[in-house]
Amino acid sequence: MTKKSIYFGTLLLTALAFSSCASDDTATDKTAGKDTPKTGTVFSSETEPATRTSATYTGSGLDFYWTANDKIWVKDDNNIYHQSSEDDIANRIAAVPGSTTTAKAKFWVNGTYTGSTHKVRYTGKNGASDKVTIKASQTQNTPNNAAHIAEDGDFGVADATGSGKYTFTLNHKAAYVTFMPHTTDTYITGAKIKKITMWSGDENDHLAGTFNMDDNGTLSGGTSTTNKVTLTVNDFTIPTVTSYTANAATMVVTPGTYHNVAIEYTLEVPTASGTPITGTLTKLYSSVTFDAGKNTPVKTDLKVKVYPANSYYEWDAAVGQNFWKGYEYGSANPQQPTVNGQKNPTYAPQNWSAESASNPRGYRDDTSAPTPFPEATRSAAHCLNVNEALWYCFKGDPHSDIELWALMGHVYAGGMWFKKQTVIATENSKTIIQLKDKAPDNIDYRLTGWLGGGSQRKINNNVIAGKPSNLNEYFYLPCLGGYYDNGLLRNLGVLGLLHTSTPHPTDPSSAASIFFYFSQVAVDFGNRSGGFQLFNSSNENEYRPF
């Protein structure tokens, strides 16, 4: 095989923009060291703007540069692809103190090239001539420096034209997403970004994987594919306004249109105690198209969901008589405990007592009612019943989550996702009415109940960590804890507790509730006096954080 020196000039940047037609590469020519003669065939990028393999965001698009160890592939006269064996990238970088990139480069490649056109491929630093791997786990260490894309999935193709010397325009064929979150929310002031995760609602989608690539840059035959990509970053800051210099983070993904796309930002949030909280903030998009060779900017104002303080009730208390009625956080006379371990017996409802003239916030008094006691008729009348709670518990595919939210001036992370009732009904060939009438074991526990607090407690330990893929099929409940004797606040940010509409059929002090934490969901009968949340199964998105 003969060696022939072929000059490849002008790597022109194909538009990598916010829209499919606008070119936004505003790079200017950079000064570098003189070209160093080597043996072999020469491929050279000389004219700006040029397509390269490291990227920075300019405010209107991605500007690319060559980095150390970049390689290209060229098809010779025998239709065999050869990888460049040498280049002058290192010399050019060394000629500019402090630089890690260069605007120009020459590559030397073996092979025989006599045609007027030769195919060129770039398959990333770890690619073969016909294989591209877009990684599911990517890392960017410095804001607005996406040098990692060469390692994590960037690829492109070109037609080199000429005679003796060849020029080509390298067309990037990967899709790029540049995240630039900011926040106007004081709850997360000073927070750092740890990672950004994006996934689609269809687990069969191929956001990442290993693919075959043809001369047109079209991908096929994916293996080890996934619908989720995670970009780990190095404690990027979150400014109060969009600033690409502060935190632009670029992800490489497979081009395509994806539905029910979730973008999850994992943050480390400082707290007054000095111990930071790690949690997530998530945005959901119904449909997103990532075009080949284009960059999609994502500019998001990150905010935490703030839950109300007046949503705790004893079981079926009078409508409007929440646990701290008249003394709520934020009221004219705030006496409500706001952090775990605080209590206020002076202003709390009377311990273990039903509603009375002196205890208007107490639970419904059934001491004189005939058994079985009727379902809730007041504040808990629209809550799910015990049978529905058991369907959620055992057929709701619970997923624990660390989504961030706030309550009474403090930030917390923790909650549970459950399948929506309509999804559960469809998957189990039931109607909504049938879910209300009997539990999964075909028993109506509204009539039978059980002895609470013991071995009869219904427990599901099969809880999956992390959000489900298709969030539209699920609803969310936060771990808002509860109030107990003497108004003691417990388990805020740790445990979720919700009343049902179902009293124990014969015990006037007991009612059913559903509760959960990171590894367990349970349904049980317990004391009616607990200050828990109310949940209406016909309004499942009431607590949804985004």
What is the role of each PLM region?
Residues T2-F394, H399-A406, Y412, W417, ...:
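Sec-type signal peptide cleavage vicinity
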Residues A413-F546:
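C-terminal, surface-exposed recognition/capping segments
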